Amino acid sequence: CLATTDPNGNPTTGVTRTLSTKNSFNYNTESNDMKRNNTGGKDGWDPSKYLNIWVCDIASSGNTSVLGYAYLPGLQSWNAWKDGLVVDFQHFGTIGNASSSSDGRTPTHEIGHYLGLYHTFCESSGGGCCDNDNTWGSNVYDTPATDDVYYGSVNANTNNNTCNDLFYGFNSDLLDMDENYMAYSNHTWMFTYDQINEMNATLNGYRSSLKNSNVPVNCTGLVSNINIDNNVKVFPNPAKNSISIETSFSNYSINLKNILGKNILSHRNISYN
């Protein structure tokens, strides 16, 4: 969704374009300069009503490559003008000069942070295994513990298992969830239920003013809520060898896909009066 009215009440597409005095912004020394007019950037709009996203050329030192970054909710209450996302132009979407290495999903990852999510992999200074996105106070219990970062692609042959999840409250030892949007791997495509619940909790808490904003928006691609949770049951979850699916819908179509998105099983039920 993009705003259709700016803070002054004027019509807008939700996108502004700024001719900057800088060719790029150094992540180490200028990480917030793109957020101010007087430092070569663009002043953000009221962060209690808008989610500001600055798309620019992010420069970094050494071998570090920074695709984007965002502040967790509550961390910028004293400097609200900093709140929002910064995304390198090469990793925003998939059109034009955008890179395919992140599938254009860098904003998805950063919005996860903006809405209270941590990485799925362990970030403790001592290394080793940890259930990171639950360690730091969030209520995400359904992502397996993961030791360090996996930067590779995710496909049918990806079977990383860096931690024994039996030690972290799981009933079985699961593969690392490298396909999660909050991982650093390529070709990610999912949030878990607990991650979704955590983001909703943030929208009802720290970022409730954004959720309740009266700014008009133009939204496309939305899917109406048909209350899937109460009408479809998939168990066991997580599963290894087999799953069962139950539904109360009389008309339905089920497509089961593998990790590459290839359809491997289809079933349809249609009732006629």
Predicted regions: what is each one?
Residues T4-P7, I58-S61, H91-G93, Y118-G127, ...:
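Acidic glycine-/aspartate-rich tracts in secreted/extracellular proteins
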Residues C1-V86:
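Active-site-proximal segments of metallohydrolase catalytic domains
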Residues G96-W189:
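The catalytic-center signature of Zn2+-dependent metalloproteases
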Residues N227-N273:
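C-terminal outer-membrane/trafficking sorting elements
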Residues I53, G112, M199:
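Terminal peptide-recognition signature
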Residues T192-S224:
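A recurrent domain-boundary module in secreted/ectodomain proteins
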